[in-house]
């Protein structure tokens, strides 16, 4: 009961601080963007995300990275925004009502509401009300966040992937930091996906694309396995695509506005993009370079210097903490990648020999590109696949020809150069083909090769739809019909996948089978939840007069629903956590395993020498767990054990993963019986206790 009371108390603090932050950020955003709902929403989310990263960076640098400090700092920033920026006088953003426009506008808004409602229903069903099951989320996205909370230290090295940039993980931290468990971690990418829809819509508005085609483009981007899977996980490829389109959209607004205002929002998007993951640096540099070229051509050196100064400042403030941390702790900002010419040790080549051939630029051939094309068609569907291929193809003539001969088509040229640059980044991205030389394991799984290029798919889709809208007349009408048919097929296919009716695409179906208990459950609840959420949205939009008169009653009702949801999530999370993961891994619960291995009642330090070790941390994040990065030799195994001084070591009997990172650990344990007390548990897992720990427990003080 105490845990539930704690979670409810934290909810009150969280709601107050976030309310202040969002309202203050909205006032700042209102000064930067037009009076439109999607534009204001997108700008507000970018500002809120930037504030979250900025607060975490400074509190982590000062050694005060605690949930209470973090949340109170956000509240202070929100209060300051409200004091500094007065409310706008142009009223409520347009686009709120559903049934008051023409038939076409009504259909567009109904379609938009259903699309957003289906995404929210998907997250609530498979993200919030289910335990995390995604491989990368269990391996490092969630453990990183839990280690931050356990140690109140942004620089701790307890996770093997401690070195990755963490701007997207900070979104997870924002949702779960003060709670007793990670039961709201499934909300991480919901607002990232909604931000993607908003910036795609805004980018197409700048291209003067009709509303129906804008809706089709949003459906095309969202009805993909990348969005469907990452909506309910903590992966960050969706964030890369979102921030790429966001930076492009806001940067073009700055260029088209004759650079009257500083490009705050575009620079924030660039800074956030730099801090998502390493390959996102390439996409960020593409946007910086293309915008600098356009600014130089239209505004001269002064505009270019303004743009570059804003970008560098944003990168330092919003991403500098990650690269500075790596440089400080390991001597290279891109650890484990080093640069021998600069005197930086390169551990990446030792960890992944032959990894330079995992890019399409060096390792691609006709057969690989054929498999990649099928992977894109399967994972992204016909409309997104066609839009991506079309966008990449038309970017070359548009970018080269219209740059000189058609100055009125500058926006298409802008999108074309971004697409060309993104294509170059994708073909140079590591691990698209494989993570282990000669296996083509990533390409065989299809999904991973596609998710690394989802940012390219997003910007190419925007270019494709903008090009179709630009071609007026019969050609444009024909292309519009083709696009509409493909989008319809795409949406139907992915909807049937979500409802468990078909096995297409393969990887997404496998993921859904591991989440839903059976197809009947998905078939019944997924459309039901979608319709319910859409109805709530319709009622709220059409009864704003009633809501304004009964705001107190509506607020109390919403708060009551939130409190009930928090209490239920907290109780369910802790009650079934151990049993869920033990059944999933076909093993006893970790608590019983630890109790059997230890000889006293102290809380042990556990060294996890396997990949998906999230469940070992416990539902309350109560266990002290470390996962080493790389142990290529038996001496390295001994060195890691000596460094971390674990009470228990947990590993597999045989490491069957492609990289064989922990293959030598069971061999070391088997070959040194004098150093370990071995304990076999549940087939796959090997649990060992160092004898010096056992002896220290037995000796009386």
Would you name each region that the model predicts?
Residues 1-99, 480-513, 522-533:
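Membrane-embedded, hydrophobic transmembrane alpha-helices
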Residues 584, 588, 592-629, 646-657:
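Short periplasmic/luminal acceptor-recognition loop of GT-C membrane glycosyltransferases, typified by
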Residues 100-108, 205-213, 257-261, 295-309, ...:
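Membrane-interface helix-loop-helix junctions at transmembrane boundaries of multi-pass membrane enzymes
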Residues 21-22, 195-201, 292, 370-423, ...:
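Hydrophobic, aromatic-rich transmembrane alpha-helices
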Residues 283-315, 509, 513:
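Perimembrane helix-loop-helix junctions
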Residues 34-44, 183-184, 200-225, 242, ...:
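Transmembrane-helix signature of polytopic, membrane-embedded enzymes
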Residues 120-123, 280-281, 483-543, 553-584:
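Transmembrane alpha-helical segments
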């Amino acid at each position: 009961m105490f845990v539930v009371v704690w979670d409810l108390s934290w909810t009150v603090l969280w709601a107050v601080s976030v309310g202040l932050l969002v309202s203050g950020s909205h006032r700042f955003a209102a000064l930067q963007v037009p009076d439109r709902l999607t534009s204001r929403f997108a700008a507000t989310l970018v500002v809120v995300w930037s504030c979250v990263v900025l607060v975490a960076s400074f509190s982590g640098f000062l050694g005060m990275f605690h949930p209470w400090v973090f949340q109170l700092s956000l509240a202070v920033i929100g209060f300051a925004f409200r004091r500094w920026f007065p409310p706008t006088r142009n009223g409520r953003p347009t686009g709120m009502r559903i049934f008051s426009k023409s038939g076409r506008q009504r259909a567009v808004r109904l379609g938009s509401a259903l699309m957003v409602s289906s995404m929210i229903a998907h997250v609530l069903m498979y993200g919030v009300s289910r335990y995390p099951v995604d491989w990368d989320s269990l391996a490092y996205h969630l453990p990183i966040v839990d280690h931050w909370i356990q140690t109140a230290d942004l620089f701790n090295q307890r996770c093997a992937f401690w070195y990755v940039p963490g701007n997207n993980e900070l979104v997870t931290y924002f949702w779960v930091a003060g709670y007793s468990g990670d039961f709201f971690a499934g909300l991480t990418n919901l607002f990232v996906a909604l931000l993607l829809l908003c910036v795609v819509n805004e980018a197409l508005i700048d291209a003067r694309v009709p509303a129906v085609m804008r809706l089709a483009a949003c459906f095309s981007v969202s009805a993909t396995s990348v969005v469907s899977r990452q909506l309910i996980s903590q992966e960050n490829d969706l964030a890369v695509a979102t921030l790429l389109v966001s930076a492009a959209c806001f940067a073009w607004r700055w260029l088209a506005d004759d650079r009257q205002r500083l490009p705050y929002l575009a620079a924030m998007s660039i800074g956030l993009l730099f801090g998502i993951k390493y390959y996102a640096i390439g996409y960020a540099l593409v946007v910086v370079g293309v915008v600098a070229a356009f600014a130089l051509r239209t505004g001269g050196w002064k505009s270019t210097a303004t743009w570059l100064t804003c970008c560098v400042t944003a990168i330092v403030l919003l991403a500098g903490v990650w690269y500075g941390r790596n440089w400080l702790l390991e001597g290279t900002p891109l650890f484990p990648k080093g640069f021998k010419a600069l005197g930086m040790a390169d551990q990446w080549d030792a960890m992944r020999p032959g990894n330079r051939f995992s890019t399409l630029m060096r390792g691609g051939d006709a057969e690989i590109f054929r498999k990649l094309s099928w992977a894109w068609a399967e994972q992204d569907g016909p409309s997104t696949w066609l839009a991506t291929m079309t966008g990449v193809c038309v970017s070359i003539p548009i970018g080269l020809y219209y740059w000189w001969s058609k100055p009125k088509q500058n926006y298409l040229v802008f999108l074309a150069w971004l697409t060309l640059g993104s294509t170059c980044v994708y073909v140079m991205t590591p691990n698209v083909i494989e993570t282990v030389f000669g296996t083509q394991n990533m390409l065989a799984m299809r999904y991973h090769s596609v998710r690394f290029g989802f940012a390219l798919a997003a910007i190419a889709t925007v270019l494709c739809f903008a090009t179709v809208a630009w071609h007026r007349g019969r050609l444009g009408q024909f292309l519009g019909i083709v696009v509409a048919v493909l989008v319809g097929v795409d949406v139907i296919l992915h909807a049937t996948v979500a409802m468990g009716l078909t096995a297409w695409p393969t990887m997404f179906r496998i993921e859904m089978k591991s989440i839903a208990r059976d197809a009947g459950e998905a078939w019944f609840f997924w459309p039901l939840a979608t319709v319910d959420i859409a109805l709530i949205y319709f009622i709220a939009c059409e009864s704003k007069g009633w809501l304004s008169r009964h705001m107190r009653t509506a607020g109390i009702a919403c708060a009551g629903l939130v409190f009930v949801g928090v209490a239920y999530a907290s109780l369910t999370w802790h009650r079934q956590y151990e049993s869920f993961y033990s059944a999933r891994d076909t093993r006893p619960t970790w608590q019983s395993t630890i109790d059997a291995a230890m000889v006293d009642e102290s809380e042990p330090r556990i060294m996890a020498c396997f990949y998906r070790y999230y469940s070992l941390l416990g539902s309350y994040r109560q266990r002290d767990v470390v996962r080493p990065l790389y142990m290529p030799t038996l001496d390295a195994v001994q060195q890691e054990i000596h460094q971390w001084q674990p009470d228990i070591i947990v590993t597999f009997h045989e490491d069957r993963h492609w990289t064989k990172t922990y293959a030598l650990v069971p061999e070391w344990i088997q070959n040194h019986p004098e150093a370990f007390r071995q304990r076999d548990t549940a087939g796959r897992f090997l649990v060992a206790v160092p004898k010096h720990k056992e002896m220290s427990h037995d000796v009386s003080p």
